[in-house]
UniProtKB/Swiss-Prot annotation:
GO terms for molecular function: ATP binding; N-acetylglucosamine kinase activity; zinc ion binding. Belongs to the ROK (NagC/XylR) family. NagK subfamily. PANTHER family: N-ACETYL-D-GLUCOSAMINE KINASE, ROK (REPRESSOR, ORF, KINASE) FAMILY. One of its GO terms (biological process) is N-acetylglucosamine metabolic process. Catalyzes the phosphorylation of N-acetyl-D-glucosamine (GlcNAc) derived from cell-wall degradation, yielding GlcNAc-6-P. Gene3D superfamilies: 3.30.420.40. This is N-acetyl-D-glucosamine kinase. Pfam families: ROK (PF00480). The gene is nagK.
Length: 303
């Protein structure tokens, strides 16, 4: 059995999957915030309960926001203070007497989608998250490409390309990002960025769901806004695809619930790609809230 943990600032969620990649059981407990020992106990108790329930010693994978393992072997995860700065993988492997694998939550999202029954036909899969921020992951032959610093797939911190500035206007504001750089595409393509673009052009403070509701009602201003956003997304994604050249792009995050993102994006991409490039298949994520647990569990699938 494959045990997948989706760990965040408020909850530890465990999903148990069988060899057919089907969810058999899940359980959630609060994330201890102050005690590392309590954090380890919470994870180990869930594993013990699953082992007893299924009569086996399941493999353990964990998805967690941040950098799963720094150069000194410790976790960096600002949203999980009880475990941040601690050698989480080594400590859990020792206590559970098995190989524990960690990856960041964005890679686990991408891995979950790459192992969808229909999507396994694609060797190179890009997961793109358009949510509070912009991120994602790359999966090749069923395994995440992490890089030495676990920043592969941090698409949101690429800067706006020149053709985007030409499209939006050379006086378009280059916003400072939380990472310290200027002009990161996260500030324009995330859900917050979608709302910021609206306020920038129309001087009205609306949130993304409100703008999308206007779009669905046929509001001309909202439709012009969505056209502009999709053009900007196509420019930025075209630049990424020139490097990655994936077979499939799976879009998750809050904006993935807006059908225009997946239905209208592919037609805009060719003019931003090399003439010989083929537009990848573009799909909305299929596994929702279970994606983090699925992806973490599937860190062991290609053994």
């Amino acid at each position: 059995m494959y045990y997948g943990f989706d760990i965040g600032g408020t909850k530890i969620a465990l999903g148990v999957f069988d060899s057919g990649r089907q969810l058999q059981w899940e359980k959630r407990v609060p994330t201890p915030r102050d005690s590392y020992d309590a954090f380890l106990d919470a994870v180990c108790e869930l594993v013990a309960e699953a082992d007893q329930r299924f009569g086996c010693k399941g493999s353990v994978g964990i998805g967690i926001p941040g950098m799963p393992e720094t150069e000194d072997g410790t976790l960096y995860a600002a949203n999980v203070p009880a475990a941040s700065g601690k050698p989480l993988r080594a400590d859990l492997s020792a206590r559970l007497d098995r190989d524990v694998r960690l990856d960041n939550d964005a890679n686990c999202f991408a891995l979950s989608e790459a192992w969808d029954d229909e999507f396994t036909q694609y060797p190179l899969v890009m997961g793109l998250i358009l949510g509070t921020g912009v991120g994602g992951g790359l999966i090749f032959n069923g395994k995440p490409i992490t890089g030495k610093s676990y920043i592969t797939g941090e698409f949101g911190h690429m800067r706006l390309p020149v053709d985007a500035l030409t499209m939006m206007g050379l006086d378009f504001p280059l916003r400072r990002c939380g990472c310290g750089q200027i002009g990161c595409i996260e500030n324009y393509l995330s859900g917050r960025g979608f709302a910021w673009l609206w306020q920038h052009y129309y001087h009205q403070p609306l949130q993304a769901p409100e703008i999308i509701a206007l779009y669905d009602q046929g509001d001309e201003q909202a439709r012009a806004h969505v056209e502009r956003y999709l053009d900007l997304l196509a420019v930025c994604l075209g630049n990424i695809l020139t490097i990655v050249d994936s077979d499939l792009v799976v879009i998750g995050g809050g904006l993935s619930n807006f059908p225009a993102i997946t239905t209208q994006l592919a037609d805009r991409l060719p003019r931003h790609l090399l003439p010989v490039a083929r537009v990848p298949r573009i799909e909305r994520a299929r596994h929702g809230d279970a994606g983090g647990m699925r992806g973490a569990a599937f860190l062991h699938l290609t053994d």
